[in-house]
């Protein structure tokens, strides 16, 4: 459902058109259908705006979803035997590089 990185202004979801407007995803009648932000934007908001400790905001974006999906043994944490999908963040929380399975996939 993510439109991040695209110029798309709408998409279909369960037979309904969802529109991208003013940082939100809405149905035709204006009902909120989601947020239009990246994961790092969500982490940054939780930390800087709501005052959540950065470590907890990062767990909310990694470990907790992996636990909910039942894949925390291999994803969402740094541990021996876990898949090495990592995001290297700068001090300003900008994404500097990403690794997928321990292999660099993108760098700024």
PLM regions: where:
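Mg2+-dependent phosphoryl-transfer enzymes with acidic/Ser/Thr/Gly-rich catalytic loops
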Residues: 106-107
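Short, Lys/Arg- and Gly-enriched loop/turn segments at beta-strand edges
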Residues: 92-99
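His/Asp/Glu-enriched, well-ordered alpha-helical/loop segment
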Residues: 2-89
